Amino acid sequence: MPFIENEGVKIYWDEVGDGPAILLIMGLAYPSQMWHRTRPVLAERYRTIAFDNRGSGRSDVPPGPYSIEAMASDAAAVLDAADVRNAHVYGVSMGGMIAQEFALQYPDRVRSLILGSTTAGVPKSVRASPEETLRLLEREQSTPNEAAEAAIPFIYDPGTSRERIDEDLAVRKDWLPRSDAYINQLMGVFAWDSHGRLEQITALTLVLHGANDHLVPPSNAEFIAARIPNAKLVMIPKASHIYSTDQPEAAHGALLEFLDSFK
């Protein structure tokens, strides 16, 4: 299993497929295995490079907090290890924040930018309802399995089958985060902000969002797409925060249409 070390932290990464490179950046407390629906689709025509953020999966759990800037540096180190100068960069949720920071810090390394289910930063973002925010904060009072179960109503669309949700839970079960790692990532999320910098992103950008996202309301995506100069917004009907599970065909169709336009 390949590891790289960045700032004294060991980061797990791997690659699947051939073709133009695409860097995949996962969200809060999720391992890179959660690309299990999207990665096989992309790997048919792209070189997919994925990694576990610090504190997640097989990567180290150093003392925190983990800043979004540090995790963007980890992403750059992964591309260095893969000997990739520039790549399509796709981040979801917290990974979308990391992808924004990556595009701001390393603009010449971004062939295109895909931002999924994300925000320009918590301090000024449109928040979830108070009930959903409380449920997220109460996660730390639960076991990891209880927390994963409690999250279902506000990260999946009500129309998504329980069978499909259970497939996601099965992927995650061996890589549930330590509570300190979750808190360390969450502190980085709450501290980060790109609202005043979005206009500086020069990459052609696709903003993907579930139309029924209860965790990160869709108005966050509208804000991002309106301020990045070369951005296109796609709202996915009947989808919530994890749109690749709610509506995989629609999500992957929009993603491939965008990526294939660069060939």
Which positions does each model-derived feature cover?
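Conserved HGGG/HGGXW glycine-rich cap/lid loop of the alpha/beta-hydrolase fold
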Residues: 7-61
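Active-site loop/oxyanion-hole signature of alpha/beta-hydrolase fold enzymes
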Residues: 50-90, 253
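Gly/Ala-rich beta-loop-alpha elbow adjacent to hydrolase catalytic centers
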Residues: 91, 95, 99
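Flexible "cap/lid" loop of the alpha/beta hydrolase fold
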Residues: 100, 104-105, 111-140
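Conserved alpha/beta-hydrolase catalytic His-Asp/Glu region
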Residues: 125, 145-197
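Short beta-strand/loop motif that positions the catalytic acidic residue
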Residues: 201, 207-209
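Acidic catalytic loop of the alpha/beta-hydrolase fold
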Residues: 212-216
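Catalytic active-site module of serine/aspartate enzymes centered on a nucleophile-bearing elbow/loop
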Residues: 231-263
